Design a protein with these regions (language model features):
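Surface-exposed beta-strand/loop patches in extracellular or lumenal glycoproteins
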Residues: 125-146, 222-226, 233-241, 492, ...
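A surface-exposed beta-strand-loop module
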Residues: 67, 138, 144-203, 259-262
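Glycine/proline-rich low-complexity spacer/linker segments in large multi-domain proteins
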Residues: 177, 187-234, 286
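N-terminal, polar/Ser/Thr-rich
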Residues: 3-13, 17-123, 203-208, 529
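Short, hydrophobic/aromatic-enriched beta-strand segments in well-ordered soluble domains
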Residues: 126-130, 143, 179-193, 234-242, ...
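Hydrophobic helix-coil surface modules that form long, contiguous segments used
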Residues: 227-378
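Zinc-dependent metallopeptidase catalytic helix centered on the HExxH motif
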Residues: 359-424
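Amphipathic alpha-helical substructures
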Residues: 308-310, 420-421, 452-526
Length: 529
């Protein structure tokens, strides 16, 4: 994680929650290959929507489509060797072992993009400021476009592309452990030609382009240490032909440098660190609304390709973001960032919403659906606390982000006079209690292929049950303290922290809800009432 923001402490050692040893549990059975997104929505999500209408909408129809690989078993990556002399590609993430790189901690990215809409080509420069966590004779970064040139601390460096996005760097001089250094990467390419698997985070059409996705998207447009365990500051400049808008994260510093007749440069700055996938870039013809909502500057953007009545509806939804944030603040504490926003492109996205930091990306079909728009916005805005301010240490920690964002839909409804969150838990349990396939997907190890499946229901059910066991005072204090302590932390830390807020032994509860591949018994000890 970055140390540039004074709120970000040094990485904490993971706390082992010894009361819940995985070895004592039956092995998780592998599930079948995850079906295609559309088929999955029709076969699984639509029945759940009926439940959501009766209970409290979960917004499952708008979950993110991910890479579909066989499930994997959680493994602990080997500790980094402080005496090592070469950074390695991949951080040993159990689901995405090649994601990220070892040997350094990024402090800040300064990204400069030149976009040519005629050739649909990016020409870019990423300046990476980092601190070496070990002595480095060489290291890697992630970029799927063509690397044109690299310098390290001002001196030319050798580079070799390896695999899909690993770029090997050999600096002219070794980098000493604990020293700061700067890497400047020049690159170019057509993002539309970069593909991994059957989907890609790049969307183009109708004179607009957007790059946004989870768990991977940065490699399509900037050089990065592409893993959520290494958040960093973002400074993004995008040069486009005059008449186009270019949208990204953080605060809009300027939209035209004024020194070019035919081009505008849009400059965005994020003042709090973020994971690489939480950054995005959108280019096209957008209508913008700017202002201040209770002290928070906002920029909302909606594609001008959408009909006027749809733009009006989309803006009306986006303008509720401030009030939704204030509701979430009553549960999770102060909003963790200095800007708010949202963007609605014309493209048919493969997700309904994505928690890009300070400015979520919303699919037009999703935000124009009046039944789902409220829970969609609440879910993505809740991610500003859970998923953005506090990121996963590894991707198998996804419960700590998607679970809370989904529970926030229940909690916000309760806070604003809607159905009680406990009623939502009981109704969901009644519908799902006999669905063995659903319960086989555990929260401790959902498997890569099912990373974003059961968590949208089992996650909020677990949290509401935990609330019932801990009591409101302890549950909300614990959740606020967790959300207000920025950093990258594992699920094991979350369980250990929860235990520290109550005298109730949570070991049996976590065995039932986090570890077990079977339905939790309907008991008071498991949080039912």
């Amino acid at each position: 994680m970055s140390s540039v923001d004074p709120r970000w402490p040094p990485p904490r050692e993971s706390q082992a929650f010894t009361a819940v040893p995985p070895a004592q549990l039956p092995p998780q059975q592998p599930l079948a290959q995850r079906p295609h997104r559309v088929a999955y929505i029709l076969a699984v999500i639509m029945p759940v929507i009926l439940l959501a209408v009766m209970a409290a909408p979960l917004g499952l129809a708008w979950t993110i489509s991910r890479l579909r690989q066989p499930p994997s078993t959680v493994t602990t990556p080997p500790p980094l060797d402080p005496n090592a002399t070469d950074g390695e590609p991949g951080l040993g993430d159990p689901y995405f072992p090649q994601a990220g790189n070892s040997g350094y901690d990024v402090i800040k990215y300064q990204i400069m993009i030149n976009w040519d809409p005629r050739t649909q080509t990016i020409t870019g420069t990423t300046t990476i400021s980092a601190r070496a966590t070990q002595h480095l004779n060489s290291f890697y970064f992630d970029l799927a476009l063509h690397t044109d040139k690299v310098s390290v601390n001002g001196a030319p460096a050798a580079s070799i592309a390896r695999g899909f996005s690993d770029v090997y760097i050999k600096p002219a001089q070794p980098i000493a452990a604990n020293s700061t250094f700067q890497v400047v990467v020049g690159y170019s390419g057509r993002p539309a030609e970069v593909r991994q698997g059957d989907e890609q985070p790049w969307r183009a059409g109708d004179g607009e382009w957007i790059i946004a996705g989870e768990p991977e998207s940065s490699a399509w447009w900037y050089a990065a240490n592409d893993h959520p365990s290494d958040p960093a500051l973002m400074d993004v400049s995008i040069r486009v032909p005059t008449g186009m808008e270019a949208i990204s994260v953080g605060r809009l510093e300027s939209a035209d440098a004024g020194n070019e007749k035919d081009f505008d440069t849009w400059h965005w700055v994020a003042r709090q660190p973020m994971a690489s996938y939480l950054n995005f870039m959108a280019i096209g013809h957008y209508e913008l609304k700017r202002g201040i909502d209770h002290g928070l500057p906002y920029v909302y953007a909606v594609s001008e390709k959408l009909p006027p009545d749809q733009r009006k509806t989309a803006f009306a939804a986006l303008m509720t973001s401030g009030q939704r944030i204030r509701t979430l603040e009553t549960m999770f504490g102060p909003y963790p960032f200095t800007e708010i926003g949202g963007i609605v492109p014309v493209h048919q996205l493969w997700f309904g919403g994505l928690e890009t930091q300070t400015r979520p990306v919303y699919d037009a079909r999703a935000i124009l659906n009046r039944d789902f728009e409220p829970v969609l916005l609440t879910h993505e805005l809740a991610h500003m606390w859970f998923g953005d301010n506090v990121t996963v240490r590894q991707w198998n920690d996804i419960f700590t982000t998607e679970g809370y964002a989904s529970w926030a839909q229940w909690g916000a409804a309760e806070r604003t006079g809607g159905r009680k969150a406990n009623d939502a838990l009981n109704r969901a349990y009644e519908r799902l209690k006999d669905n063995d396939a659903f319960w086989k997907i555990t929260m401790i190890d959902p498997g890569r292929a099912h990373l974003f499946d059961a968590v949208y229901l089992r996650g909020p059910m677990t949290l509401q049950a935990l609330r019932n066991v801990m009591g409101d005072d302890a549950f909300f204090k614990f959740s606020r303290d967790w959300a207000q302590d920025p950093g990258s932390r594992p699920l094991e830390d979350w369980m250990a922290d929860a235990q520290s807020y109550t005298t109730v032994d949570l070991g049996p509860f976590f065995r039932a809800w986090i570890y077990s591949p079977t339905v939790p018994a309907h008991t008071a000890a498991n949080g039912f009432r």
